[in-house]
Design a protein with these regions (language model features):
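Polyanionic/metal-chelating signatures
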Residues: 1-73, 197, 203, 229-235
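C-terminal cap of metal-dependent C-N hydrolases
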Residues: 177-221
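A general structural motif
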Residues: 32, 51-55, 77-79, 106-113
């Protein structure tokens, strides 16, 4: 509730004509100074707002707030987004999900379910996926694989981690076509399966080295002689 009050206050200050008082940028207690107002005005007109919300009622409030101020918004979290999927589809607001968020971690996610992504897609909502914290980004394809296992269409899943994020956040199109940057990954099998690995990574048309700390450790500790000395030899 306090966050909504601050947001409403910030947007109200953009339209206020007062040169003094609470809304004035010259007031030491004003929420936004002139630079802050300029930044908020620019973001609200051309930027994208990401609201973290899981509870259905909070998602509805985001939709109402975005419509009131004509904002381009994205829902992040969305554990109960399936409950308000028709409203999300009508508003054209994308949802960023973790497909493994099927158990409530708080009262905000009591309605969490594994087929959340499938229900949203069926209703026409644009769905993206996240693995949560950044150090688990390598597990994103496994997260998406779980969404597919619970009804999310396979081709939509591949798009949800390639072309859809680029379209939502304004990146270059993630398509294979003449004239586009050659950013490709060649997999040993289905990229959404846990036993598949990247055979080759191509970035901007150049082959990326496939060595990493993990592959170097594998070479060092394999039982066969591979030319690398062991880090520690027991006496």
């Amino acid at each position: 509730a306090a966050h909504w009050m601050l947001l409403e206050t910030a947007f109200a200050s953009l339209v206020s004509k007062q040169s003094s008082g609470l809304w004035s940028s010259h007031n030491d207690h004003a929420l936004l100074n002139q630079s802050g107002k300029a930044a908020l005005r620019g973001i609200s007109q051309e930027g994208l707002f990401i609201f973290h919300a899981n509870r259905a009622s909070d998602i509805n409030q985001v939709l109402q707030f975005s419509a009131k101020h004509q904002l381009s918004s994205v829902i992040s979290g969305g554990q109960e987004a399936w409950i308000v999927r028709d409203a999300l589809a009508e508003a054209g607001v994308p949802v960023v999900l973790n497909a493994l968020d099927n158990l409530p971690g708080s009262f905000d996610g009591l309605g969490a379910r594994l087929d959340n992504a499938a229900l949203l897609h069926e209703a026409g909502v644009t769905v993206l996926f996240t693995s949560g914290e950044t150090h688990n980004a390598r597990k994103l394809r496994q997260v998406v694989g779980n969404a597919v296992a619970n009804g999310f269409p396979y081709q939509a899943a591949i798009s949800a981690i390639t072309s859809v994020p680029a379209a939502v956040f304004g990146g270059a199109p993630r398509l294979i076509a003449p004239g586009l940057n050659a950013d490709l990954v060649i997999w040993s099998g289905d990229p959404l399966e846990v036993d598949s690995a990247a055979d080759q990574v191509i970035i901007d048309g150049k082959l990326d080295p496939m060595t990493s700390r993990q592959t170097q450790l594998l070479q060092r500790y394999l039982p066969t002689e591979v030319g690398l000395g062991r880090a520690y030899v027991r006496p």
